[in-house]
A protein has these predicted regions:
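Membrane-proximal, proline-rich intrinsically disordered regions
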Residues: 1-18
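Acidic, serine/threonine/proline-rich low-complexity intrinsically disordered regions
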Residues: 116, 127-130, 184-192
Length: 192
């Protein structure tokens, strides 16, 4: 379930291309891209909203929660090898970091959810404060670095196509660092 929350930006209904110019689609007249072009985007009704989920996709916060559940419980499985457990946990760590990064690119500094809160958590525990830009980037990069250790160098098996490996993790890490080095965040004291 950790992979299920990866954004689906390839379909007609979720494509950013529909808001770029006069593109038309034969299937749908009112895609989210068209609604954004018409000015129907708002804080209370976001299109392409990763915070609360959109289309047939759940919220990235749900994805982070599922990743944390897997990481916390993978070592309770009795019929897996230690290597398999470590590899699956590393994939979940990477996906958790990637979901934090996607939220960061949309909303700036975000609350960091490294562990799930218990259902008995108090109101004060639930109200997690927003992190700074540096804290967000440091957390994402450190989580990716932690995941890389137990990821395979490269997945070449046809049964494992699309699974996270070191090449994918390092490429996303470079994107995170490049994004953080942009003038929007690097040295911009007015913004954050």
């Amino acid at each position: 379930t950790c992979y299920a929350y990866l954004p689906k930006n390839d379909g007609v209904y979720t494509s950013f291309m529909t808001m770029s110019d006069e593109i038309t689609t034969p299937i749908a007249k009112e895609t989210d891209g068209v609604r954004i072009m018409k000015g129907q985007q708002s804080a209370s009704n976001p299109k392409f909203g990763l915070w609360s989920g959109w289309s047939d996709q759940g919220s990235l916060w749900e994805g982070i929660r599922h990743c944390n559940i897997l990481i916390e419980n993978i070592h309770n499985v009795v019929d897996m090898t230690e290597q398999e457990m470590n590899s699956w946990a590393a994939e979940a760590k990477f996906l958790k970091a990637y979901y934090h990064f996607l939220l960061f690119t949309y909303y700036g500094p975000i609350p960091i959810v490294d562990e799930n809160l218990p259902i008995s958590a108090s109101d004060n525990e639930v109200r997690v404060k927003r992190s700074t830009v540096d804290q967000s980037v440091d957390y994402i990069v450190q989580t990716i670095d932690d995941a890389i250790i137990d990821l395979p160098v490269r997945e070449l098996s046809s049964n494992d196509l699309g699974r996270i490996d070191q090449v994918i993790a390092k490429s996303i890490k470079s994107r995170v660092l490049l994004y953080a080095a942009s003038p929007l965040f690097n040295g911009n004291s007015e913004m954050y």
